[in-house]
Amino acid sequence: MKKKLTGASFGILGDSYSTFAGHITEGNNIYYPRPAAVDDVLNVEQTWWHLLMTRNNMRLLANDSFSGATICTDVRPGHVVANAYPARAERTFSGDIQPDYIFLFGGTNDNWLDKTIGQVQYGNWTEDDLKRTLPALCYVLDYLVKKNPQATIVVPINTGFKPELHEGMLEAAAHYGAVAICLADIDKKSGHPSALGMQQIAQQIAQQIEEALQ
């Protein structure tokens, strides 16, 4: 662990949970705000990352979150491979911005869409390997670590994942020296964090990072 949260800079590589209109990479799919589905997350200040940022006087350098995105490159209908996590990691975290923290928050769509989980794999990835979630996650972690050696990589793991996905994400995070955050009891509406859920995510991330610092 290289730096405490207080005053740190950070970037996000995420999915719908981390989107908010006007606050993500231009052209990315947006989920929040969506009052018809989540009626109480209406302002960017209510998102998990903005709460974390405000409470810890942090600076957001990039939020490359894309609603509906999978970690693996076997993307959902209507998406292209460039929407998946490997291509977006290369686009946004190639080493130019050098954040203190990178939050790699994903896997929810892989889990919902029953994508092939596969096994952890720490090198020699082929295009077919990246169509499976755990090899693709390892590829992304490997890229982030190599291009951003100054950064602490944080991997929040959503609730409700298949056990083999949850355990594989823990194993991959440990291999790459990332901090895995095991989220628990997150309040949701239509499968997405409510205002309370966003607060819970921010609190659990901060608490578990603090524990990892000790």
Model-derived regions: residue spans:
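Short glycine-rich His-centered loop
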Residues: M1-L42, I71
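Serine-centered coil/turn micro-motif
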Residues: S16, Q46-T47, R132
